[in-house]
Amino acid sequence: MTKTADLKGSNFTLSVLHLPNDDVALALNMLEQKVAQAPSFFASAPVVVNIENVSNEINFVELKSGVERTGMIPVGITGCKDKEKQAQATAAGFAIMTSFTPQQVTQKANMQPTKVIKTPIRSGQQIYAKDADLVILNHVSPGAEVIADGSIHIHGTLRGRAIAGASGQAEAKVFCKNLQAELISIAGNYWLSDQIDKEYWHQNVMITMVEDRIQIDTLTL
């Protein structure tokens, strides 16, 4: 029996660039700076642009090329009900995307046994625990990346990037003994190092998602 192409609906975690005002050039400059802090994380990553707070006319061709210059891939716009703007965005190659409140992705029933790594994670290395939690019994160096579909436990210093809930599980957590991260992410929501309050720097912490926002708590144990 010949197989045919099948079109199905699915859910993906996408980054959203929120334009805070009419200064699109400033927002693109900010995006470029953020990408420069973690280029491997953002490289070729799809991004949606929210233009809800932009009241002036937008040059969508320039907006698209500006995002592409950062190395990210602009796939669509959201926050726009103006039909004329939608037509201009479509002509520039953007998809029109409707905002919605996603249902929380629950932990998979077929989670695999926890992946345990005893050696240091060195710069340039990437460790991925597919459908599992990840335990690192050592340090994570700058430029290294640890990823898990579940939670991440680092029994050492986190100087690289930790990406938990990679498949969208918002209940995933990141634990580390000494927080000095380049980037932390849970279910597609991320903070770069300059977004982490200094009170948590060098601390034993738990990182969670609370009401769609990353939260950091210090641990005393």
UniProtKB/Swiss-Prot annotation:
Cell division inhibitor that blocks the formation of polar Z ring septums. Rapidly oscillates between the poles of the cell to destabilize FtsZ filaments that have formed before they mature into polar Z rings. Prevents FtsZ polymerization. Belongs to the MinC family. It holds the Pfam family MinC_C. This is Probable septum site-determining protein MinC. It comes from Aliivibrio fischeri (strain MJ11) (Vibrio fischeri). Keywords: Cell cycle, Cell division, Septation. NCBIfam families: minC. Transmembrane segments: none annotated. Gene3D superfamilies: 2.160.20.70, 3.30.70.260.
